[in-house]
Amino acid sequence: MINTSPLLNYVSSHHDIKAINQWRTDVEKQLQDSYENGQSIREIIKARSDLVDEALVFLWKHAELDQSKLGLFAVGGYGRREMLPYSDVDIMILSEDEISEENEKRISTFISSLWDVGNFKPGISVRTIQSCVEQAATDLTVATTLIEARLITGNTQLAKWPRRIVSQTWTDKTFYDAKMAEQAKRYHQHNNTESNLEPDIKNAPGGIRDINQIGWIAKRHFRVNRIYDLVHLGFISEFELAVLEEAESFLWEIRHHLHRLAKRDENRLLFDHQREIAAKFGYVRQEGQPVNYGVEQFMKRYYRTAQQVSTLNEMLLAYFSESVITPRLPNYERKIEVVNDHFKIVDNKLAVQHHKIFAEHPSAILELFYILANRPDIEGIRARTLRLLILAAKRINQSYRDNPEHQALFMSIIRSPYRLYDTLVAMKRYGVLGNYIPAFGQIMGLMQYDLFHIYTVDAHTLLLLRNLNRFREPEFAKEFPVVSSVFQRLARQDIVFIAALFHDIAKGRGGDHSELGAEDAIEFGRAHGFTERECKLIAWLIQNHLLMSLTAQKKDISDPDVVKDFAEKLGDMEHLDYLYTLTVADINATNPKLWNTWRASLMRQLYTHARDVIRTGLGRPVDYQMLIEDTKFAASELLVNNFALADVEKVWQELGDEYFIKESADEIAWHTQAILKHGDNPEPLVLLRAHRKAAQDAVQIFIYTRDQPNLFATTVAVLDRMNLDVQDAKIITASTAFSLDTYVVLDRFGTLLTDPEREETVKNALVKALSQPDQYPGLMQRRIPRQLRHFDIENTVDVTLNEALQQNMVEISTLDHPGLLARVGGLFMMQGLDIHSARIATLGERAEDIFFVTKKDGKPLNNEEVKLFSEKLKAALDEASNQICQH
């Protein structure tokens, strides 16, 4: 029992209605105290609804509506007695006939008093029975609210009418079809997934609306008031009801905290609130645990809960359709096809032959999915079969996993050429995959608290498998021509499938997830018929699944030594082919924004160069002189028809060997042609073109100008102002004191090369800034994205010496924010450092950038200078991060 102050203690007379404000404030505090003292959320929200009833009854009488024949109904969540702190108070005033002028005045007084009181957020409709009929017939929302309309006070004869109206205006089928279409639209608005990074816990798949949906459809047909009443009718089991009620209470508690923190009706579990709400549920990081452990465990519970809710929603509503709606259709005849002794296909859905199949033949659990994987014409699983399957999945134990028949069935599913992804998603959804591979069950719902990994680990893993499977399909071969060709010639595609399944399976355990996952995979592989050599290959792929992406992202792959070192780690073409397919599929399954033609070109270049090294022999040293001569010859072939070779050589002799080692013949010819045409023009030369190896979304910008101290800082500041994101930079200083700079940029608007006016604007901005070296453009003030303010990222600076280049390599990891590169470039300028090249990577909210620098005299920093510079750069990054958090 929750003790709250009686309203009459505050309103001694009907003229004192504004005292209701104070009463509501006081009882709200009493409700919160009760909640904090252990009262269930279910009791709290019901008590709040009852208190609102009490206030409305008082105001109804205050307006003298108790003397009318009108009825006051609670609708929506209020009608279900589900009131959160800032929920709307949705009410309907119902009349049998046209409302008299006197009653209209009373209603006006009542509505005014609701607004005068102030703490209510009323949503009010005033209807006659006839207008209800007319509106319900054409408006699904009106019909839905009528199903759960609850009489608060007034004419009791009206209590039966709301549901009666829905029965008159909608059949079981029309209402079901309309609500399912509405749900499909709602799902689409939330990306058809339960695991959005900032989920709407009310409306997203697996949210409160999914539970409401079951109630609306079932209550309309069975004429019951509570979902609990459906147990006695056999529509839902006691176990299923318990799961739904536990999930509902958890979701209500989250909403309760969201309302309190936001001080409004908030349903989105934003990054702003996730960590604080996690702590309220007791998910707090302990000493020694990762910094985001608490919030990630809380979100894991949420995602698992949402998965349970959406699965029950799917199953129960399918059961309603199959048991109530379909058999009533005119001229209905079931289409039945016998598959074998265990299964049949009924109306295009798979069903068991009898209800004891899974108990008597446990292998049928996996057999069902083998049939689904190999019969694309089957549309799903019958609801009764699904109910049996979900229960049977709980009986999968070690003895089941060790059965050779079951192991063979599982591998047959993995090797299915048709719809592997859909089948594995179903196996996960219905509890089979997580029970058959317990380690997979541990990562279900596990999120990583960042903007880089936008899927839970289990969802990401299955998307990776989907991507691999797509490399078989002609329509995706156009999008991924090289990797599709490589994948299709793999001797054993199931090897990379198992590597994909286990590559992240040890996340969340602590320790190196690649090493732990490799151990799990070896054990699994041995049990499932892989040879020792194949198991070692699977383990190697898992241990090295980040090798290729990190090499392409963080190293200069135009450097032959970098490629040679990478190729030596692989050893042969088999390892390269498997790793390439796994890496491309992995990147595409992490974040759709991560993959673009620039990154694709990096991966393709690294694969091609490594392939050439492996084919010509790993033991052979790089012949730099031959490489330079070959590149010069190829470039001169592109220039010979338009320029005298003597003029070409004059330009080239000012450039060092490194230029001809790292630039392609095509780019050298482009640069040389531009320089020769530019002649003695004192203005900086700026050219733009589509990146030849990366298509339209990557743009090359070539700058030829007199060398100056702030060249990089000025350039990146201008590019940031032009909404261009730098991905790569190469700065070559000729012996004539001219600088040849090549930038690869991604255009935030995607119009740079199709809009001549914008292209000219970018060129002019660069020319103007570079012509005035003393006027360094200030950093542009941009709005910091809301999401960035909630990530606690440690800023790191690592400065090492590259012996071969005699340059310092500066690696920074920091919170990405607008103007970061320009800020860093300005600091390099102030410290008197020249940047020779840069590799820029943005991974969600994190920036991981690498710069190669020297002092003005061309020498690297010494140890003391490195220490001093590192401290200054770290301090600058810390200051920038603090400013972001304070905004």
From Swiss-Prot:
<comment type="function">
    <text>Modifies, by uridylylation and deuridylylation, the PII regulatory proteins (GlnB and homologs), in response to the nitrogen status of the cell that GlnD senses through the glutamine level. Under low glutamine levels, catalyzes the conversion of the PII proteins and UTP to PII-UMP and PPi, while under higher glutamine levels, GlnD hydrolyzes PII-UMP to PII and UMP (deuridylylation). Thus, controls uridylylation state and activity of the PII proteins, and plays an important role in the regulation of nitrogen assimilation and metabolism.</text>
</comment>
<dbReference type="Pfam" id="PF08335">
    <property type="entry name" value="GlnD_UR_UTase"/>
</dbReference>
<dbReference type="Pfam" id="PF01966">
    <property type="entry name" value="HD"/>
</dbReference>
<dbReference type="GO" id="GO:0006808">
    <property type="term" value="P:regulation of nitrogen utilization"/>
</dbReference>
<dbReference type="InterPro" id="IPR013546">
    <property type="entry name" value="PII_UdlTrfase/GS_AdlTrfase"/>
</dbReference>
<keyword id="KW-0677">Repeat</keyword>
<protein>
    <recommendedName>
        <fullName>Bifunctional uridylyltransferase/uridylyl-removing enzyme</fullName>
        <ecNumber>2.7.7.59</ecNumber>
        <ecNumber>3.1.4.-</ecNumber>
    </recommendedName>
</protein>
<comment type="similarity">
    <text>Belongs to the GlnD family.</text>
</comment>
<feature type="domain" description="ACT 2">
    <location>
        <begin position="809"/>
        <end position="887"/>
    </location>
</feature>
<keyword id="KW-0511">Multifunctional enzyme</keyword>
<dbReference type="InterPro" id="IPR002934">
    <property type="entry name" value="Polymerase_NTP_transf_dom"/>
</dbReference>
<keyword id="KW-0548">Nucleotidyltransferase</keyword>
<keyword id="KW-0378">Hydrolase</keyword>
<keyword id="KW-0460">Magnesium</keyword>
<dbReference type="GO" id="GO:0008081">
    <property type="term" value="F:phosphoric diester hydrolase activity"/>
</dbReference>
<dbReference type="InterPro" id="IPR010043">
    <property type="entry name" value="UTase/UR"/>
</dbReference>
<dbReference type="GO" id="GO:0008773">
    <property type="term" value="F:[protein-PII] uridylyltransferase activity"/>
</dbReference>
<dbReference type="InterPro" id="IPR006674">
    <property type="entry name" value="HD_domain"/>
</dbReference>
<keyword id="KW-0808">Transferase</keyword>
<dbReference type="InterPro" id="IPR045865">
    <property type="entry name" value="ACT-like_dom_sf"/>
</dbReference>
<dbReference type="InterPro" id="IPR003607">
    <property type="entry name" value="HD/PDEase_dom"/>
</dbReference>
<feature type="region of interest" description="Uridylyl-removing">
    <location>
        <begin position="339"/>
        <end position="699"/>
    </location>
</feature>
<feature type="domain" description="HD">
    <location>
        <begin position="457"/>
        <end position="579"/>
    </location>
</feature>
<dbReference type="Pfam" id="PF01909">
    <property type="entry name" value="NTP_transf_2"/>
</dbReference>
<dbReference type="InterPro" id="IPR002912">
    <property type="entry name" value="ACT_dom"/>
</dbReference>
<feature type="region of interest" description="Uridylyltransferase">
    <location>
        <begin position="1"/>
        <end position="337"/>
    </location>
</feature>
<dbReference type="InterPro" id="IPR043519">
    <property type="entry name" value="NT_sf"/>
</dbReference>
<feature type="domain" description="ACT 1">
    <location>
        <begin position="700"/>
        <end position="782"/>
    </location>
</feature>
<dbReference type="Pfam" id="PF01842">
    <property type="entry name" value="ACT"/>
</dbReference>
